[in-house]
Amino acid sequence: MNWLFFIVFLGLALFLIWNGKDRFSKKEWVRMALMLGLILLGTFIIGFFFKWLSLSLSMFSIAAARHYTAIISISFLCLWGLKLAVVLLCTIFAWIIGFHEVHNAENYQKISSISNKFGPGLLIAAKCLVSFGAFLMFYGIWLTAAV
């Protein structure tokens, strides 16, 4: 079961990292903040559901219910954080280039040509690093935890 959840969450993470939505509008930033609230609310709902399963149906112990509640909520928080990391990297880079366009106009053409030349490769490298981090996080969450 742990392998299944590892593969599912890693697949979701890779989809979120590589889906191409690297820049957010204000509406999408608000949605991202609401997703954090929903993840935290979902943690309580999942916790009560697993506790109910353990007490009424005796499917597993309360300790196992707490364990799975924790690792599922941590997995969703990791998904949220990974997408946030990719979007923040792209946003910070865009802000730096925008700053140079306004406040460093005499050198903006040089910087712009360099960023156009190396920017896509750096974005791919950053996404590869975040993907590797996702693999390490979900491996640690799902495959090294013992109940």
Question: Which residues are covered by each model-predicted region?
Answer:
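Transmembrane alpha-helix entry/boundary detector in multi-pass membrane proteins
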Residues: 1-4, 24-39, 64-75
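Alpha-helical transmembrane spans of integral membrane proteins, capturing the lipid-embedded, hydrophobic core
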Residues: 6-7, 36-44, 76-80, 84, ...
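Loop-to-transmembrane boundary segments
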Residues: 69-72, 111-135
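Short alpha-helical packing/oligomerization segments
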Residues: 64-102
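A generic, lipid-embedded transmembrane alpha helix
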Residues: 31-57
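N-terminal signal-anchor/start-transfer transmembrane helix
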Residues: 2-26
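Juxtamembrane inter-helical linkers in multi-pass membrane proteins
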Residues: 96-115
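Juxtamembrane boundary at the C-terminal end of a transmembrane helix
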Residues: 133-147
